[in-house]
Amino acid sequence: MNKIESRHRLIRSLIMEKKVHTQQELQELLEANGVIVTQSTLSRDMKALNLVKVTENNISYYVINSIAPSRWEKRLRFYMEDALIMLRPVQNQVVMKTLPGLAQSFGAILDALELPQIVATVCGDDVCLIICEDNPSAIECFDKLKEFAPPFFFSK
């Protein structure tokens, strides 16, 4: 087992044994077990392990999120980071503009995700038209797809 795997195993074990409230607390627990990590390394580890903070009786602590993203969600995020040009709702549709040749890939991924808001996708070379039941469904679909867009994509 390499260094990263053993550190991940230790983090999982610490999270399951004890309610860890902060990243600093987790870092101190790791140090108490002989593992020194920087804050940035710990952040990457926490993301890789899919740790999320939950609140119970006004007390927050980390748990392992057992609902891991699907391979289709990962693929959508990857494509959106590399090939998304524009995304916007238009009445009961969402228009997705992509790099040339990739719209059909987006359509296939969206179809595989089976999002409840999407009735159908119609794709050309660089545009994927996402058809929804009604205007509110299109806004809901747009909001869901925005979650997969790269940070700051909509602040351009």
Curated annotation (Swiss-Prot):
Pfam families: Arg_repressor, Arg_repressor_C
Record's subcellular location: Cytoplasm
Keyword DNA-binding: yes
InterPro entries per the UniProt record, alphabetical: Arg_repress, Arg_repress_C, Arg_repress_C_sf, Arg_repress_DNA-bd, WH-like_DNA-bd_sf, WH_DNA-bd_sf
Pathway assignment: Amino-acid degradation; L-arginine degradation via ADI pathway
TM region(s), chain numbering: none
Principal cellular location given in the protein's record: cytoplasm
Protein origin, superkingdom: Bacteria
GO cellular component term of the entry, any: cytoplasm
Keywords associated with the record: Activator, Arginine metabolism, Cytoplasm, DNA-binding, Transcription, Transcription regulation
Biological process (GO), any one: regulation of arginine biosynthetic process
Single GO MF descriptor: arginine binding
Family membership: Belongs to the ArgR family.
Job description of the protein: In the presence of arginine, coactivates the transcription of the arcABDC operon, with other regulatory proteins such as ArcR and CcpA.
Listed name of the protein: Arginine regulator
